[in-house]
């Protein structure tokens, strides 16, 4: 019997993106502190701009958006304004899960008590966590419903990673992985695919145990690939690398929303979506990190390997009946473009293998981050220089 409430989730969308602040001459990461990007950004965008732990990371976030078109408009506006602001202060913004050659040892920590506490607790694990992600919040107001939907949605996390994989380089080396970001983050405690939870109370008991035994001081330090957000009434997808193009971010966010909408419909009809163990899903996560779209994943039901692109096509078919109601047909259709032209890692590697120059890869990342946001004269003239 389902424990879920009869209250339908709003399926609202919130998107958080993490950008790299780049020196336009060296193409290395550079602190945004002296340029006051965050402070100036807050004057333009209020709380939609935030610092992150490293001084070369800027985080932006939308408000609560009622549909994917609203989210797209807001992300476009934020990207345009923060890119202009960066250029006016002799910086560039690049989107990717890692920087191709930046050295984490050289990065300064943002002067904030929260980040100082994390570094003091996790030491080198925190200092080395020079990564950039995309987080997607989907509105699920009832907590019991959120836990049950999280249980089911875990299966789809590796497929989302394969689509978003955009971190093939680390400290100047070609890693052989499409997403090295997730391997860096794995060093943190309380990460990866969550276990199954039978109820919200079971999850609450877990959180309370960690707090009472001084493992954590709040539930935000549970950094799973998907989690019920401790302060917002949302399910938060956290597995994705930061994509380069706006259209990629929106396509992946739309797919996250459609997956939750479809899973809720299944439960609403008193049907069940089979739950798989964390250990099985972790096998697919490794394959997604290692091979991206070019590998095979396990179809657990058929107990066989299937090309990743084929399984993602099956997911698109799986959610197809909820897409018209969500109004996201055009946005989700972009998933097929990603599969045709490659994810961000594929395209970064293509540039590197053609040029042998990681600085050219950074140039490409900057171009793709700005793609479609401005008239051609903007990037050609280098507005704000």
UniProtKB/Swiss-Prot annotation:
It is an enzyme of class 6 (ligase). The keyword Hydrolase does not apply. Signal peptide: none annotated. It catalyses: L-cysteine + L-glutamate + ATP = gamma-L-glutamyl-L-cysteine + ADP + phosphate + H(+). Pfam families: GCS2. It comes from Solibacter usitatus (strain Ellin6076). Belongs to the glutamate--cysteine ligase type 2 family. YbdK subfamily. This is Putative glutamate--cysteine ligase 2. GO terms for biological process: modified amino acid biosynthetic process. Its EC number is 6.3.2.2. ATP-dependent carboxylate-amine ligase which exhibits weak glutamate--cysteine ligase activity. GO terms for molecular function: ATP binding; glutamate-cysteine ligase activity. Keywords: ATP-binding, Ligase, Nucleotide-binding.
